[in-house]
Amino acid sequence: MMSGTGNVSSMLHSYSANIQHNDGSPDLDLLESELLDIALLNSGSSLQDPGLLSLNQEKMITAGTTTPGKEDEGELRDDIASLQGLLDRHVQFGRKLPLRTPYANPLDFININPQSLPLSLEIIGLPKVSRVETQMKLSFRIRNAHARKNFFIHLPSDCIAKDKFFTSSDDPTNLTIPNRDINERTLFLDAFLLCASNNNSNNFKQTYVCNRCINREKRRASRRKSGLNDNSIWQNNENKRAIIFNSKQLFIISNNGLSGNSNCINFDLPTRIVCYCRHHKATNGFVVLFLLRDHNGDILAKTITDPIMIMDKKNASNTTTPTSTSNAQVSPMTNDTRSFSSPQSDLNFPSEFPLPSNSKNFVISTNCMLDSNCNNNNNDNDNKNNIKTNTAMMNNNRHFPSPNSSSEDSNHSFSDIHFSNNNDNNLHRSLDSWSSTGFNSSSNPALTTLTSDFSAASARHTGKRQRSVNEPFMSTPNTFSRLPQKFIDSSKDISNHNSVPVALNNKPSIQRVIPAQGSINGGIEVTLLGSKFKQGLIIKFGENIALSSQCWNESTMVTYLPPSSKPGPVLVTIVDPSETSMRNNSNSSVSTSNSTNDILHLNKYTGEKAIFTYVDDTDRQLIELALQIVGLKMNGKLEDARNIAKRIVGSDSSPSNNNAGLHSQNSSLNSYTNMMRNINDEQLITEVIKSFKRNNNLSTVNLSMCDVRGRTLLHLAAFNNWYSLVSLLIKYGSHLNDQDLFGFTPLHMACINGDLRIIRLLLECNVNIMKKTRNGFIAKQFFLMNYTVNKTRYSNYETSLFDDILTRLTKNTTGSSDTQPFERNVSQSSFNSSLFDDDDADHDYVQERKYLLADSAALAPEQSNCNDNTSFSILDSDSGYDISDCESSSDEIALEFFNTHKIKDFSSKPNEIPKTTKTSIEPDGSLWNRMLTRLNDELPKYEDLFPKKPKNWELGSKSVEIGPDNSAQMTVDDSQTSSEDDELEALQVGFNTIFSKKQNFQNDKMLLFFWIPLTLVLLLCFTLSNLGKDDDMFHNLSKIVQEYLRIGLAKVLLGNERMKTSFKMQLSKFQNNNILNDMRVN
């Protein structure tokens, strides 16, 4: 390495000669940087080297002589490489100082005429509707530009998205660039977001970023790799604008001849608007004001874009076309704006369900499958068009099913995803052929891996077990083999109807049912995937109408499963009520039957494999609910039914160590098992409830406790045809009119699947038959829909019973709907009806059949003339009686009363209650006990608290009988005397009545002998303390009392020893400062 001044000088001359030989225009900046590097690397030279000093002088002379004519002489090359090198040497990126940008009011530039400015600015690619998460690609076109081809664009500091894109400057408010060449070639772009005006006037409104959107952007920035750095952009800048650019603050633009005009320069900017229109009440949307300035601050161009709506939800129809903001003709854009969108921006899928990382691969594989299907079904020319159309529609119409919180029987996996297309039949057929093949690991392992990833993500979110990833899209092909012949015939008719191409274009179709099976009790959430869905459609599972239906979009519907009378597979069909005018008036029997028939006979549409399978698990639900009731009684808390069963059986007990103990345990277990085999589930639950009765614990057991769907034991027992359990529950005070989450009462459940005896029993209990379910059906409609078809199966007696029940339902339908099951003036002993006398008898079907044969003929005609207030049945929850009222009389008394006072006693005067039915038994229990045991009772009526006086109420206790002969012999004096006596007696009775109405309170003694004296003592003490002198007897006495109280409380709380210890500790900490010693010396 050479050293010394001569060496550096020789290197300088040789380097300059070499540069001038190769290129006639030496770059002074490049020359300076190279020479400085050589000088630093040379150990013998320094910064004070004469060669370097001569270099600086030479540079100054050369710069002074060549700068004025630099552009004319072409010393600085006007190509991208030279300008980029110049930018890299003089400008550094990365914000290091806090932003303190000056405030700029955009309304000051509204009235500037764009035609008077030297340049013209056009904005292309701004959509009409967008979201805050969507990044838009805006194309800028500068017309009438300078003769130069290349420029620098400088973006405002308030619109930069990330810290690494800022230009590092010591003064952020200074917009000039240190290098003069860069500064002169820079165009400064400004952007302001404004609220659009109602008309074409310039009445715009300034906007800002609201606090909610700032917090959202903070969370968004904190998720990046840069972390808190980008988060600080939204914290320390008060003038942050609502439009941001995801680009460097300073970059180069060039004209590559794309526009065909050398005076036009184009460049693109990824842009995002970060605030919603509704946050600023911008009903007409936002507009963006763009300004273009030079390095001196003069405005060169101005433009205002068309309005854009920033909405929360994505527009349903993706037909928004980019608009151009200019008066000139704009050529169509060929760039794909979706490349700047987030992966979830085009999916109708909530943000809490993240997409897998390889979702793009899945879309590619889907297109490949679509291409193969198209190649198999069409010729080569049609394939190209179909593939383009299908791919475009796949990008625009990708819909995922709603991930609502499903019920306990529903599962979701990635195989449930359905890509819908509502406009192209070829894509519809290709999707059907693709979905019928299912996911197979051998045929497509990539899809299997992707499916497992998505299923794992869903399992982490829902916490439930998911289906296997190898499960096919549809049910097994042999599902139809289990259907009845009549069901297959009806399904053929529907499938033939759906096979018409014209009908498929306009009618809804179901492609998938999730889950594919559920309980016959209903109540679970079922998701339907298909096409052409709309709000207002009626979903039917077999002949049962769904409890509720909600349309999410054209390809997804969410329904709730209705109860069914029998298990097995059924077709899921769609009914369009708009095709037939439905009569919803259910008050009359004619209109009710007509509306039901209209629903049953409407045109049904379904897919080829829309099948749902009902599973009978009512026994299990009954056992679980009964175990929960028992566990609540045993432990005082709700537990899982499995744990309660283990505790009852004794599985938690430790096993015996000796063989004799094991043998005895096994023998007892075998005997218990043999005993349980002879007892069915109904008898088991019945015996458990009776055991509470025998132990006098029935009042503490809540027999009306419900499950997660709001159904009680009475609901499930009536649905499962358990007549004995229903009778026992009604006798022990179970609630008769309770409704579940979907509005079903026990009568509704009995009309769907219950025995006719159960329906009649509930009707005799005078339940409210006019209660409607959530979907607007009453019990009679369910009874007609589920029993009209099977009417011929019953015997002659049951057919007559069917007619009798239908007559009662029709007759009661026209009556009052607010009748309560029981009234206050009915005898309490009548609540224990003879229907429940035989508790220990075997409720065999033959015996019950004989009972109904014996009583139906006698009771039906007589009860038809009875008033609802005089019905003999058990106590319902809505009547307000305690459960103990049902047990006030023995079964023998109830039977004797029922046989003695039959319904014929009321046939003479239906509105008058006989005197024999008036009770003389006082209600059992106080108001507090009733409040604890019957929390669901209604409040007492005014007539119950203050009963009306009877019409024959007399003033005196004596009654005077006046015969017809004596009344004729009365004189005028006697009448006057009797009238005066009556007035005096009436006055005396009036005074007695006033005093007799005095109410006795239990707290009168407490008020007179404690509270009033205590109040007087406190008032006296307060008066003496305020009015007396400081040294009087009262104050001295109060001080003594206070001292003794303090000492006494201290002894009680701390004790004598503790008090002494604490006192000594306080004395040891006492600081005397030698005062005692000084006093002792003196």
Swiss-Prot record:
Amino acid composition bias (Low complexity), ranges on this chain: 316-328, 376-391, 399-416
Record's keyword terms, sorted: ANK repeat, Phosphoprotein, Repeat
Keyword Ubl conjugation in record: no
A Gene Ontology biological process term: positive regulation of transcription by RNA polymerase II
PROSITE patterns from the UniProt entry: ANK_REP_REGION, ANK_REPEAT
SMART domains, sorted: ANK (SM00248), IPT (SM00429)
Keyword Repeat belongs to the record: yes
In-chain residues carrying the UniProt-annotated modification Phosphoserine: 468
Positions of region (Disordered): 315-346, 376-417, 457-476
Note from the entry: Present with 432 molecules/cell in log phase SD medium.
Record function comment: Dosage-dependent suppressor of Ty-induced promoter mutations. May exert its suppression effect through protein-protein interactions since does not present any of the motifs generally found in transcriptional activators or DNA binding proteins.
Name of the protein in its database record: Protein SPT23
